[in-house]
């Protein structure tokens, strides 16, 4: 078992000398779900929801014509 893991199994943020335990590159690309994948899915969902609002403003009850 690694010395870096805490009692709950998570890796600590810093080594004893103050350096980060995990580089920013690994924090960005590793884990249960990579952060870039979560950000991409979230951004796509936001664009989709905004698209629904814009579509609704030009069609249906709210349109000017």
UniProtKB/Swiss-Prot annotation:
Its main location: membrane. Disulfide bonds: none annotated. It comes from the Bacteria. Keywords: Membrane, Photosynthesis, Photosystem II, Reaction center, Thylakoid, Transmembrane, Transmembrane helix. GO terms for cellular component: photosystem II reaction center; plasma membrane-derived thylakoid membrane. It is a single-pass membrane protein. Belongs to the PsbJ family. One of the components of the core complex of photosystem II (PSII). PSII is a light-driven water:plastoquinone oxidoreductase that uses light energy to abstract electrons from H(2)O, generating O(2) and a proton gradient subsequently used for ATP formation. It consists of a core antenna complex that captures photons, and an electron transfer chain that converts photonic excitation into a charge separation. PSII is composed of 1 copy each of membrane proteins PsbA, PsbB, PsbC, PsbD, PsbE, PsbF, PsbH, PsbI, PsbJ, PsbK, PsbL, PsbM, PsbT, PsbX, PsbY, Psb30/Ycf12, peripheral proteins PsbO, CyanoQ (PsbQ), PsbU, PsbV and a large number of cofactors. It forms dimeric complexes. This is Photosystem II reaction center protein J. The gene is psbJ.
